[in-house]
UniProtKB/Swiss-Prot annotation:
GO terms for cellular component: HslUV protease complex. It comes from Staphylococcus epidermidis (strain ATCC 35984 / DSM 28319 / BCRC 17069 / CCUG 31568 / BM 3577 / RP62A). ATP binds at V22, G64, V65, G66, K67, T68, E69, D280, E345, R417. The lineage of its organism: Bacteria, Bacillati, Bacillota, Bacilli, Bacillales. GO terms for biological process: protein unfolding; proteolysis involved in protein catabolic process. This is ATP-dependent protease ATPase subunit HslU.
Amino acid sequence: MDTNGIKLTPKDIVSKLNEYIVGQNDAKRKVAIALRNRYRRSLLKEEEKQEIAPKNILMIGPTGVGKTEIARRMAKIVGAPFIKVEATKFTEVGYVGRDVESMVRDLVDVAVRLVKDEKKSLVKDEATKKANDKLVKLLVPSLKKKAAQGNNPLENLFGGAIPNFGQNQDEEEEPPTEEIKTKRSEIKKQLEQGKLENEKVRIKVEQDPASMGMLGTNQNQQIQDMMNQLMPKKKVEREVSVETARKILADDFADELIDQETANQQALELAEQMGIIFIDEIDKVATNNQNSGQDVSRQGVQRDILPILEGSMIQTKYGTVNTEHMLFIGAGAFHVSKPSDLIPELQGRFPIRVELESLSVEDFVRILTEPKLSLVKQYEALLQTEEVTVNFSEDAIQRLAEIAYQVNQDTDNIGARRLHTILEKMLEDLSFEAPSMPNAVVDITPQYVDDKLKSISTNKDLSAFIL
């Protein structure tokens, strides 16, 4: 986890969010305060810590205005485990479908991956050295010893598939001769100089366990985990390049070098203290009519989510995790329903409310130009790989923003995502022809934009389908 990130002041956090997200200052301020409060809580005495729960946030605003991106970027700034789920994917306990506890298990999986990646980075040099030593032996193998063992009758019955658990599965090798030692020394130098990266080598890799798809999602996962622990891991041979083999072997050696149990415990603590769960489309499970069966089911999902927000002990394959100090961010457009349509207990668990504004033409202009890797910069970089230089004029960017805004007004308002569809449509011909026009320079002007888009953007029926 990035310990420096969590110490950032709210101003610093907002400043970092501004590098990627345009506008929505109120939302940025509130998530920055929530993040800073976590740091403040970490400095308190243990008994004080237990009394202070995070203030969950409810974001209200149309799609494409930055709700998810603000939460995701915030988590990335501090290296906190983050998971996005959709409330509509869950079903009430007792029905077929995902139960709400699965989002906590998914968060723990993310935390485990974060912790293990960090620990692996600390032993990367040692793991890479071991991987290179192994590669040298694979490229210049010793003679194999003949296996002195009789046939197991069960092997014939099961097609030779009975593993010999009592013995080492790798074939034993003869001690290397002087000639082999000399060759290995030469190969080692060539490996260090990067001369053998494209050479092919055969290595043994763990085979992915077969999926058990006939059961429901959660039952499937639990039984799959149990079977994976009981059954020995099967390895298969693959022919890969030296470069790929080094990555695979280094990852395997890094796994062996880190303490798995300690890593799992640290991941559980990280998920408990720093985990962020983003519940999207929470407005879709809100209801103001409790008569229909569908509304009763939606209310059931709300009641299932409630204990997790209040603090529950959830069993995962890595151990039990407490949700009491996780930060939950609910989000929804609330076009049809209102936050007050959520059950009162759930409303009370989202004390911080923030309304995100719809995007204006000026916002679209800023989105196209200001972020660290804005959409315009992305397309310029992509086409530059084909040696095609694309230059967007300020007037062209203004025209693109106006068209995006107008199409959003005339059809469904999908916020900044409209810019993706419009840019893709405008640059479709150029992207197709780019490989055959090296060293070309293309100036994107308002006239170019209109030639490619005006006939579509002015026709509401066409723009509804194409843009």
